[in-house]
From Swiss-Prot:
Annotated InterPro entries: NA-bd_OB-fold, RNA-binding_domain_S1_IF1, S1_domain, TIF_IF1
Keyword RNA-binding: yes
Gene it is expressed from: infA
This protein's GO CC annotations: cytosol
Sequence intervals crossing the membrane: none
Positions of the S1-like domain: 1-72
Protein name as it appears in the record: Translation initiation factor IF-1
PANTHER family, alphabetized: TRANSLATION INITIATION FACTOR IF-1, CHLOROPLASTIC
Function recorded in the entry: One of the essential components for the initiation of protein synthesis. Stabilizes the binding of IF-2 and IF-3 on the 30S subunit to which N-formylmethionyl-tRNA(fMet) subsequently binds. Helps modulate mRNA selection, yielding the 30S pre-initiation complex (PIC). Upon addition of the 50S ribosomal subunit IF-1, IF-2 and IF-3 are released leaving the mature 70S translation initiation complex.
Organism: Salinibacter ruber (strain DSM 13855 / M31)
Keywords: Cytoplasm, Initiation factor, Protein biosynthesis, RNA-binding, rRNA-binding
Length: 73
């Protein structure tokens, strides 16, 4: 069985939570829990409320996602 493709959406960080977790509001208005990806942690990329980010979500659980990119302002 092939692995399902991740869904990529853009959003804005609303709130920073403990353990590199963030509340993210997507462009369609939904709010999800965003976790910082491992490569972003390794490269010390900081995320602050108000930042625009790209989130990957699994088609099986649309309430959580992985933050994979922070857009430059």
């Amino acid at each position: 069985m092939a692995k399902e493709e991740a869904i990529e959406k853009d959003g804005e960080v609303i709130e920073a939570l403990p353990n590199a977790q963030f509340r993210v509001r997507l462009e369609n208005g939904h709010e999800i829990l965003g976790l910082l990806s491992g490569k972003m942690r390794m490269n010390y990329i900081k995320i602050l409320p108000g930042d625009r980010v790209k989130v990957e979500m699994s088609p099986y659980d649309l309430s959580k996602g992985r933050i994979v990119y922070r857009y430059k302002n």
